[in-house]
Amino acid sequence: MSVAENKSEENDIKTPVLDRKNDYPSLFCGKTINFVRVCINNTGKYKRQKRYKQEYKKENHMNERLIVKSFGPVKDLDIIFKKVTLFIGDQGTGKSCVAKLFSTFKWLEKVLSQKKYKLSYFEQYNRFKTKLCAYHRIDSFIVNGNPYIKFEGELYDFLYENGNFCVTDKGQDIKGISKVMYVPAERSIVSVAENKSKLLKELPDSSETFSEEFVNAKKFFQSGYNLPFEGLRFEYDSLNDTGWIHGANYKVRLTNASSGIQSSLPMCIVSEFLSSKVSDKEEIKLSKEEKDKLEKRVAEIMQNDEYSDSIKDMMIRQLSYANRYNQLINIVEEPELNLFPRSQMEVLKSLVCNNASSDENMLVFTTHSPYSLAIVNTMIMGAKAYANASAGQRRLIENILPVKYQINEEDIAAYRLSSSDASYCQSAINPNTGLVSKNELDSASGDIMRIFNSLYQCYAKTLAR
């Protein structure tokens, strides 16, 4: 087949031709289109590798799978991540460990898709332990025991087995770059530390990264930020590097605010800041070296006469996607920290709203709070009611719980982790109702009430004497 014939066939795909007025900068926008991947053989002819249907569809990353055995507190689990995924369980059952592994693999997918590292880099010299797991300080779990870890992602599969780490490229076209944010339980420290950099350096690397984003978020909301509860407002004095909380009749420095404010403000403001970056399809900041490489690659594509215009357009689109955010992976430890139940609801509504700002976003959180589960059930029920309602009923539902705070039941996964070997990880979703199981909501209160009733019976006997 001649090159001319091949060009004609490729043009039959009817790929939208991009605006070339400003060369490649104008290409860095829009939704993804899968393209025909080609390579040139020794004779200069095209060799087709894969041909993808050109269609817009919901992405498959909402069903990413994690399998873990014998990794620290994590005994044996096989789970699917969805748009909203939550973990509940006692202390020390591995909720945070699972969340940190997910964060690690999503970050790894990100940097590999940007071609910042070769696949072999992380496969060699035990870097999975010393670089990746050490970032979250879960590297010690590899020393003890012989863990098995497998993550089936959108773009790559990762496997750690018998001390070896293996990465497999699934050959998928990228749709954009993820902004992966791990919000640690220690986040209140960034509120009280403010500019005490030495204190922050003692934290895990993940906490230091979160602290940096908190600084960026404070600067972004220079005119102020409204907390989702109690009518409170945060204002940042950049000149003196000081945060202030404004209430109805008072003003207090963030360092002197309540523990609930200190833990929730960094989480909420960073989540909203990053979700806005993703919604705006913000370009990733590149170093001069990275910009030079990008410009060189674009020039190579545009000057190659063997590529048809449609192929050039699609190849440059792929370059654009590798440098533009398209989703926020927001991983939050215990969003309810130090908050009254009513405030817990407002904080969760804020997180869910930010998550809903893009179809690609994902929210993962751990919790100890039965109130959080009840709130999630309210959000699921809101979506179920809205889906079946008439126009008039929908207006009523919107007044009770707006759509931006609702969660479709097919978009949520919930898992209970326990200390029992036999039932370590179980789904907390009732398959009949699509809601978080009533047992998960009532287990703690049931234990408390049983103790109360026993004590009340003892008390009643003392009165009968």
Q: Where are the regions that the model predicts?
A:
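Conserved H-loop
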Residues: 362-371
